Amino acid sequence: MSKTYLTEKKFSDFALHPKVIEALEKKGFSNCTQIQALTLPITVKGHDIAGQAQTGTGKTLAFLTSTFHYLLTHPAKEGHEKNQPRALIMAPTRELAVQIYTDAQPLAQSTGVKMGLAYGGDGYDEQLKVLNNGVDIVIGTTGRLIDYVKQGHINLNAIQVVVLDEADRMYDLGFIKDIRWLFRRMPNAAERMNMLFSATLSYRVRELAFEQMNNPEYVEVEPEQKTGFSIKEELFYPSNEEKMRLLQTLIEEEWPERCIIFANTKHRCDDIWAHLAADGHRVGLLTGDVPQKKRLRILEDFTQGNIDILVATDVAARGLHIPSVTHVFNYDLPDDCEDYVHRIGRTGRAGKSGNSISLACEEYALNLPAIETYIQHAIPVSKYNSDALLTDLPEPKRRHRPRQGQPRRNNSAPRRGNNTQRNNRNKRPSHS
């Protein structure tokens, strides 16, 4: 596989609807990524596809472009009613559903295709109001979709396009029964175009494709190493007692423009957030118990640069398109080796370089062999000097203080800091 992010293939090379091409050109999209170049020859013909590609290589635009083209070049079913959308896009998480909806806005504006959201947590009446006015595309999560279908707000009998995004994650979260329930209420597979995209095309994902799709073509964009050529990986072995101080020292030294810190539990994320917030960093927290509106606001602040550091469980590791993440810290090595790939895939996206720093502590170091076997290479190890770790650190603050997005160092610190006491230390660990 070429290491180049974009191919020589252009969107204009395909027989896409002129309004789709117009929307893409307005957003500056000219050349296709590899997954897009493989997908469009299949979908412009209306054929089914099951695609595998590394996270961040353009899967979303591939299926959105295909969906809008299909709806613009095929008439709605005869007798089509207001509560019958023509296309359904299913995502494993609320955040991903919202992200897909946002990414589709330029296409919707140029084409006049109407969209609606359906995800749980909040916004029930607001979502329903949009759906009741009639939409062409519904983007949502399975639970809320089933709710609306059971109540008659959505009827799936006129579906012409189905997209299942992050299919492997759907299995991981236990949504496969919901997916099959929804498929049973649609026209049969031969009467619709079906698209499935996933970071991995495991046996169970292929089985789902066989069940619910019409002889799909399989395409794969598999890098020579699962973690990507553009990501610099690094591993430290801290003791449990030094783990937090090592993280804070690395942040002070690296001073990342935008980074995500992953931990395995909500409690650990709370603790990391409290330490970094007390130290004056602009930090946000994204865990399962954060209310949906607040989660979306935090993601928006992070995307807009109002927050520099996002502390998260794996809820944020899949599907979210957050640009320009320069660093990913694995405070805990994940229990699932695939999650390591998905986590660090938040950086090094769209052809940019990125950095992944992992801490193999006493509790989670046993996860390392499986991870390295899965990614087919050893993660380079760096050593550190315990005496060089930061010591003048404030006590962690309560979760409600300070507010999300508090400026680093009370807005007075420069990007690389002029704290003489800290900068005089040899904080950066030496490489082995």
Swiss-Prot record:
Matching PANTHER family: ATP-DEPENDENT RNA HELICASE RHLB, ATP-DEPENDENT RNA HELICASE RHLE-RELATED
Gene Ontology CC, one term: cytosol
GO biological process, one term: RNA catabolic process
SUPFAM superfamilies for this protein: P-loop containing nucleoside triphosphate hydrolases
SMART domains hit by this protein: DEXDc (SM00487), HELICc (SM00490)
Motif (DEAD box): 165-168
Binding site for ATP: 53-60
Family: Belongs to the DEAD box helicase family. RhlB subfamily.
Keyword Aminoacyl-tRNA synthetase: no
Annotated spans, Disordered: 393-432
Biased composition (Low complexity): 404-423
GO molecular function: ATP binding; ATP hydrolysis activity; RNA binding; RNA helicase activity
Keywords: ATP-binding, Cytoplasm, Helicase, Hydrolase, Nucleotide-binding, RNA-binding
Pfam short name (any one): Helicase_C
Compartmental location: Cytoplasm
Residue ranges of domain Helicase ATP-binding in the record: 40-219
Name of the molecule in the record: ATP-dependent RNA helicase RhlB
EC class name: hydrolase
Assembly description: Component of the RNA degradosome, which is a multiprotein complex involved in RNA processing and mRNA degradation.
Domain Helicase C-terminal: 245-390
Entry EC number(s): 3.6.4.13
Placement of sequence motif Q motif: 9-37
Swiss-Prot/TrEMBL catalytic activity: ATP + H2O = ADP + phosphate + H(+)
Record bears the keyword Lipid biosynthesis: no
Native source species: Proteus mirabilis (strain HI4320)
Function field: DEAD-box RNA helicase involved in RNA degradation. Has RNA-dependent ATPase activity and unwinds double-stranded RNA.
